[in-house]
C-alpha cells in the first residue's frame, strides 16, 4: 500500500498489485475510519488519524529476508514476499539472480513469523548439496544437514550384519548344542546391530533446521518415511525441472510430499520440453490446479498424430492459471541492483579416496619443503642455495605434486593422460564430482541460449570437457552446440577465428573453452557467463580471466563468473594464494588497508 500526503493537507492511500496478509491488515485499518474512494485517482481519501495508523503499521511489517545475515536485493524481496503470502509457488528466475538465498529466506522468515514450525527440506541436484549447505551457513545461523540414504549412512553396520549372518549360515550346517547356543548369541548381535543402524540413520535428522537432500536420496524409502514421521512443514525443490516427468521415480518421490504446508520450486527454465513439464511441477506445488492429466493434455497440448506432441495451445489461459502460483524474474529485473560482475562460487565433494590421496600428496609436499629448508640453512645466500642440485630436484618434485593434486581435483583423466609415470601413482579410479557439477551448470546456462566461456589452465582438459559435453548431447539437445577453443598452440589468426568468427559472431557456438593463453587480449562481449574450472594460478590471472567478459563493449549490463571448487582439495590452497595476492593488490596498488 502506498500513502500520499497532498499539498492541501489531504491524505490518500493506494492499493498495490499484491494482496497479501499485510495488505489486508492495512485495509482493515481503513475500514475503521470514514473514507471516500476517489474514482478518478483510484485511491482512498482518508483522515489524518487513519494515515498515521497505517504509516505506523507499515513500519512494523517485517521486511522480506529480514531473518538473513545479508540483505536481499529488491527483486529478491519481491520473490520472498510473494512466496510467503502464497505459501506455495514456482520461482522462475534466470541464472545468477540468487534463487538460493530466496528459498533460505522464505524458510527463515516463515519460522520467525510463526507460519511454520520444525525443520524444513530443500531438494537439490547431487552436485549442489555442499554448495547449498555453505549458502545456508553464509546467510543464516540455521543448522543445515545433508541427508544420506539409509544404505549409505549405515554401510559399516550393514557389513557387520552380513558377516555375522554368514557365521550363522555356516553354523546352521552343524547339528550340535554348541552351534545352537552360538547361533542364538549371533542372532542377538544382529538385532543389536539393527537397532544401532536405525539409531544411526535417524540421528542425522536430529538438531537440524534445514535438511538438504538430492533427488536420488529422496527416492530412498527410509528417508521419505522419516521425513513424513517428522511432519515437515516446508519443502523447496531447487532446479524443479528435474521432476518434469510425472512418471519418473524422482517426481513420484517429490509429489509424495504435496501435502506439506509450504511448498516451493525454483528454476531458470521450468518448462524445458513441452507444457506437460508444468503439469508435473504443479502436481507437487498445487495439485488441485490441474487435477487430471488427461484434461490438461486435452486443453493445453497439441498433438500431430501417433501421440507425438507438436506444441501447445491455449497458452494465455495456461499462463494465467500458472501466474497465480508463479513469480517470474529476468536479468532486467536485477540489472539495476547487481554489480557489473557477479562472482559465484560453487562447491562439490570429492570421493573419500581422492581426499585421502590429496592428503598424501600434501604430506609429501610438506616433507619435501622441510628437506629443502634444511639444505638452504647451510647457505648464507638463498640464491646460491637454489642452485643446489638437490634443491632443484626437490623443487621439481614439489611442483609435480602440486600439479597432481590440482589434476586430482579437476579430473583423474588428466593424471591418466599424463606423460609422467609418477602421476599414475595418484590415480584412485574415482569419477570427477567437479566435472559433473560443470555439466549441471552448463545445463542451466545453455537452456537460456546465452554464451559461456570456460577457463581451465590445462590444455588437456579441453578434450576431457569436450568429450563429456558431447556425451551429454546424446540425450540433452541443449548441449548440441558448437564449441570454440583457445590455447597456446594457436596462432593469432586462429585465436581470432575461434573467439570472434565462431564464438562472438555465430549463433551456432555457445561454448568457448580456453586455457590461460586466452586470459589476455580477447574481448568476449557476447558472453554472459564465465566459468573458472579451477582457481587461477594468481590473482593477476584471475583478474585477467574475468576481464574477458567485463568489458565496455559487452552487450550485457550484468555478467556472471562461476568458480568451481572441490572441497578438501588443492583448490582450497589455490584460493588462499589468490587471496594473499589480492591483499597485496588492495594494500599496495589501491591503498586499501
Regions found by a protein language model. Give the residues of each.
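A conserved SF2-helicase RecA2
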Residues: 537-543, 550-593
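Conserved pre-motif I regulatory segment
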Residues: 60-92
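SF2 helicase motor core recognition
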Residues: 219-222, 273-275, 462-464, 496, ...
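Conserved Walker A/P-loop ATP-binding site and its immediately adjacent core
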Residues: 102, 117-139, 273-277, 457-460
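Accessory DNA-engaging acidic/polar modules
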Residues: 1-69
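Conserved Helicase C-terminal RecA-like lobe
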Residues: 94, 102, 107-112, 121, ...
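Conserved P-loop NTPase motor "coupling/switch" region that bridges the ATPase
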Residues: 119, 138, 150-174, 180, ...
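Inter-lobe coupling linker of SF2 helicases/translocases
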Residues: 212-218, 224-231, 249-260, 291-418, ...
